Amino acid sequence: VGRVEWKQDMNKVVSFLKSLTWKQIVLSVIIFVCLALWAGLTVFATVKKNGLLDQTAAKRWSDENNAAQISCFFTESTEVDKNRIRTFENDLDKVLLEASITAPNENARLWADAYSASGKLTLSSGKTSLADAAAIGIGGDYFLFHPVQLLYGSYFSGNDLMHDKVIVDEEAAWQLFGSNDVVGMEVRIGGVPHYIAGVIKREEGRFAKAAGLNKTVIYVSCETLEEFGVTEGIDSYEIVMPNPVKNFAYNNVKEKFGMDETRMWVVENSARFSLKGLLT
């Protein structure tokens, strides 16, 4: 009985296909190809975005798709210090208040930001030293935007009262201590004790290579880098904030910093790494 029913069903399918015109067949093929292409592009975009965690802070900050991540890059001749950033933050709070954008509760934050400076410094442990290592001095919630892969320990915040935390990669840990499980160990920077907060896996791939992150990079506070290292000062600023309408966040960040394009380059990461942005 089962074979008879199957044969009858197949006959119906064959009859249906024979009843189609060439125009209907071509249209059906086009629709199928478009659906397959759309599905493939969606998977491609998702995989690519997931590999760029430092570009997707807005998605991690809000599941409601109403936030934007904005990055600002300053030229070498542009001087930006913590006071300038504090002034910007105060101006931003006023903008959000005027737009009647408020936090859902008193413990919630409307925005989070970070800034960083690139440079070099030397750190030592006993008779072993790591000279002129590439360093990033951080401020604010830097690791919210750059969740580098921790092997041991934890991140630290640029807002910490003490500025004596260090994050190293596993290669640097081996060079300094002969082990990669070194959380809490002391290193000296400029003769001042600092302590290993975390050990990370060194980043790989062409994006990491382009950013110079495929080699040893030490993460310290901006204060440590400025005092004991060599740096040109703060060179980037990042924020994730409400974006109730298109370009609200981008336009306000650009306006409140008040710098022209010869001094500051502004990017909306969340738009740049949308499906449309990834394909253009």
How should each PLM-predicted stretch be described?
Residues W22, A45, F273-T280:
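N-terminal targeting leaders of exported, membrane, and organelle-targeted proteins
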